[in-house]
Each structure stands twice: as C-alpha cells, then as structure tokens.
Amino acid sequence: MNTAKPWLKNYPAGVPAQLILPTQTSLVDLLDESFARYPKRKAIESMGHSFSYEELNVLSEQFASYLQSLDLPMGSRVAIMFPNVTQYLIAMLGALRAGLVVVNVNPLYTSRELEHQLNDSQALVLVLSENFAHIYQQIAEKTSVKRVIVSSLGDLLGPKGLLVNFAARYIKKIIPQWAFPHTRFTDALQLGKQHLFQKPTIDPNAIAFLQYTGGTTGVSKGATLLHRNVLANVLQTDAWLEPVLRDQHDQQLVFLCALPMTHIFALTACALLGLRKGGLLLLVANPRDITGLIKLLAKHPEVNIFPGVNTLFHALVHRPEFSKLKLSNLLVTIGGGMAMQKKTADHWQAITGNPIAQGYGLSETSPVVCVNTPLIEKFTGLIGLPLPNTDVVILGEDGKRMPMGEAGEICIQGPQVMAGYWNQPEETRKVFTVDGYFKSGDIGFMDSEGYVTIVDRIKDMIVVGGFKVFPNEVEEVLASMPGIHECAVVGVEHRKLGEIVKAYIVKDKYDLTNADVLQFCKEQLTSYKRPRKIVFVSELPKSNVGKILRREVRKLGDSSS
C-alpha cells in the first residue's frame, strides 16, 4: 500500500482525502434519490424536446418492466446502440433498474465489431436506433441475441417526431433498408406499462456495465464495472467539483452532453453525474455537426459543465461564430479521452474565460483517476491529482516504485477500479499487481506535489480523436485481404485528431491500389480505425526472430517502393 500521498496537500479546501462511500447502495438507489428529489425539474433536452425527472422515472421504469416481462435471469446482458438521444437514457436506466447489465455499443461499429461484442458479452437483448439496424441485420443469425428493440430517432418527440422520422427515411435517406423480427421501442414502453414493475434488490457488487475497451492484443475486452465501482466514481467526481459548485446548490446545473454516452467518459461525467446533481442534460446527437452544436450553445448560454475532448474543442474555437457566444455561466470545462493540446486549451480560455481542467481515466476505472482542480487559473498540461480514495503509483519494469519525477507505468488502486475483464481471468491477472494495483499500460510520472503527467503509451496504441485504436486489430483485418502479403500499422500525428492510422503494406498482387485497401477497411472497421495513409513497401523491418519492428517502421516515411 502506498503511504506517501503528496497530492493530498494540494486538494482544494472542502475536498476530503477519503469519502465515506455507501456500502449498501447501488447505482439505481442513487438515481432513485434524484427522481424523488427533483420530479418537476427538466432532466433532458433532446432535439428540442424536454423530459422532466418524473417523466424519465416513469419511462425508464416502463422499460424496466418490459424487460422483466421477458423473464430474463438477473444479470443478463442488454446491449444498447444509440447516439445521444433520450432513448439511450431510458434503455440504460431501465436495464439497470431491472437488475440487468448494460453493454454499451459504439454506434459507429461495423457488423464485424458488433458481432464480436454481442457474442463476447452473450447479450440476450439488443436495443438500437433504426439508423444502425442494417448493421445488425448483417450478423443477426450469428449472435446470441434473442430480442431486438428498435427505435426511430423521432419516436419520443411528439408530433415533431413524425416529421423527423419522415425526413430521415425519405428526404435525407439516412436509414438503409432492413428487415428482421423486432419490437418497436414505443411498443415496449406500452407493454411495460401493462406489466407490474417489481423493484429488484440489487447488490452493490453486482455488475452494472460491461464497458468494452481494446486490449494489448487488439482483442476488445469487456471491463466489468460493478454498481459500487461506478457509484464511487460518480461520488468522487461530485466531491472533486464541489469547490466550484458549492454556490450553485439552489440552482439547476446544465450539462452539455456532446460526447457519446456509450463512451465511459460521457457516461459518468455527463449522464450519471448530471442526474446525480439533478441537472439538465443537453443531448447532442451528432457532435460532428459543429454548426448545430454552436446553435445549441447560443440557445443555451446557461451551460455550466462542458466535458469534451481536444478534437471537439479544436473544432469549436476555429469557428468564428463560436467566439461570438457568451458562455459566462460556464463553471467547469473538463478535457479527457485524449491529450489536450495547449494551443487549443489557450484558445478555448481566451474565448470562454474558462480554463480546461484536463483529467485522466480509463474504461477499467469507471473512468476518472486523476483530474486538475476545477479552481485552476489556466491550462497546466498535466493530468492533475488523484481523486479522493484513489492511490496512484508509478512502477518500473521490475515492478518497483519509481522515484518522484521519473517515468514508469501508471498503476491505480481505488473503489472505481473494475473487478476484471469479462470471462478473461488470464487477461485480468496480467493487468493487476500482486498487491492489487491496476496496471494502466500508460507511461507517466508524478512530481513532488503529486501532479501526474502522461509521457507516452505502452505498446503502440493509437488515439484517434479520443478513441483508442490497437494496431494488431487493424493489421489482422488488412492481413485477411487478398493481395496483401504483410502489413504494419502505426500512429502518426494529426493536427485535428491528435493521431491517425497509417498502414505500411507489402503486397503480393501488383495491381492492388490504395482505393482497394480503403474500401476493404470501410467494410471491416469503424471510421476512426481505418488507415488514413497507406504506403506500399517492398519489405518491412524485422528483428532477428522475424518480429516486425514498429519503431523502425515509423522511420520509413511516405515513399512507396
């Protein structure tokens, strides 16, 4: 156990070193408190339509009741695949309230990626947006799923929803054709209304989420997050923000939810923390629509809390119309998911007057581990201090603690750390030290004041716009393509996305083209995993035992041979 915790002396006044965390409380109990305390408050605004806490309570209970009517065993997995719309929150909360396990699915996934996640989790139910139904249809017969619930984006928007759905299908034509047995989301709610909801007793040690993350082998693994893990991280983050929020207790906080809530950062820092605080969640279904996001911010200058990633902040500050906004109510801007660039952070503060407090976390830690104090006056470039109840040590390759200021692997112990990887005991064993610290796989160092800095990443992980990409997965896909003899994938710097994927290919088919490779990858990989640059070479550098040396591959440049 680490007894030296230099970060504690730098905690803001009012933030305790140790929180007294509830031992008999589930995440559902925490949410029920908010439903009871704030029934008339607005909980959600999505696509111009709002829902109160009372309405969210009723709708999520109806969905929970519907799930119970399916006679699923407690702990069954429910996969959910939505952008940031009200249906996601209803399905997620409903599954938790029914005593089931939420499997968040990236809505950008290809059929191959979706198939793996559904089968690995053994999900019995899939709830998804109609926009992605054609993706599931391609692998429907290959999965463990027994029941599919499909929703159109406009389903809960009243009369306006009819127009939204009509436009999506027949004007914008963004809904590809699909056909398979399913239940409509609205029908599920009606069926749930007819079924008496039986509130289950949920053990805090029960699984709440299987949050899938890449592994060092490139195989996507489910981080097993218990109710007590996620509950702890919500309470830790709440306590950490208290110094800037303590004067707002009588006012409703407004959270901008631009990051996808299927991602662990937004799930905790936007959705669950927002509901815990009785906040209003402004849902952004398409954060790539920067013009639409700026219009939303113009309509809601009262935004108080803005979690984001560097690419989002970068896109906003480079729009002239963003600089005209008056975001004087902005209390906290949290940067996570990828490294923040100082130029972007400084530009953000110059426009908004609010510094970006950079943090650090992982899917395996629910996610927040470290974050800068929200009282900072300017961007620091550091990932901040460990949260209350959290211990961080820097270990060398020999497993021994590194001296202050020297780099090693960031290792974490705390109530937010996962129980392990779903059905992968050997992989779980690899990522924990003998005394119970989670080995993050990231290289960093801690200074004498307890501030942590990220230096580099172990292995060769690539971070594209905040999303982790593992070269082995991309290489495996490329290697399966006829005409490719060998390949190696590396990350290269990119001004907007941080990094992009670059592939070096040795071909055994002379007429293989860049376009051929890009089309193949489009069918097999979600967009951020696809190579943006492709270089054909005659051979790849290897070690004396035949291992491709990525560090040497990076030196090859852009010249094809």
Describe each model-derived feature in a short phrase:
Residues 279, 303-308, 317-378, 391:
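Gly/Ser/Thr-rich phosphate-binding loop
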Residues 109, 126-130, 298, 414, ...:
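AMP-binding/adenylate-forming catalytic core of the ANL superfamily
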Residues 52-54, 208-235:
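Conserved AMP-binding A3 loop
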Residues 57-62, 190-195, 223-247, 313-314:
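Conserved structural elements of the adenylate-forming
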Residues 45-51, 64-112, 130-131, 258, ...:
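Conserved AMP-binding/adenylate-forming
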Residues 175-212, 219, 244-254:
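Conserved pre-ATP/AMP-binding loop-to-beta segment of ANL
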